[in-house]
């Protein structure tokens, strides 16, 4: 499944990873491309 950035961010928040946004979110966005 291809995630859009907002959807990916929402998914990470739902998974409780929002606290890692400084590290995980940019990496996840890069991996999702």
Swiss-Prot record:
Protein name, please? Lysozyme C, spleen isozyme
Carries keyword Protein transport? no
Print the organism lineage. Eukaryota, Metazoa, Chordata, Craniata, Vertebrata
EC top class, as a word: hydrolase
Record's function text: Lysozymes have primarily a bacteriolytic function; those in tissues and body fluids are associated with the monocyte-macrophage system and enhance the activity of immunoagents.
EC numbers for this chain: 3.2.1.17
Signal sequence segment: none
Whose protein is this, by species? Answer: Equus caballus
For this chain, the family text in UniProt reads: Belongs to the glycosyl hydrolase 22 family.
Q: Which UniProt keywords apply?
A: Antimicrobial, Bacteriolytic enzyme, Glycosidase, Hydrolase
- GO BP terms, alphabetized: defense response to bacterium; killing of cells of another organism
Provide a Gene Ontology MF annotation, just one. lysozyme activity
> What else does the entry mention about this protein?
Lysozyme C is capable of both hydrolysis and transglycosylation; it also shows a slight esterase activity. It acts rapidly on both peptide-substituted and unsubstituted peptidoglycan, and slowly on chitin oligosaccharides.
Q: Which reaction does it catalyse?
A: Hydrolysis of (1->4)-beta-linkages between N-acetylmuramic acid and N-acetyl-D-glucosamine residues in a peptidoglycan and between N-acetyl-D-glucosamine residues in chitodextrins
InterPro entries recorded? Lysozyme-like_dom_sf
Subunit structure of this entry? Monomer.
């Amino acid at each position: 499944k291809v995630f859009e950035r907002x959807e990916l961010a929402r998914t990470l928040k739902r998974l409780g990873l929002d606290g890692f946004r400084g590290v995980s979110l940019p990496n996840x966005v890069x991996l999702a491309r």
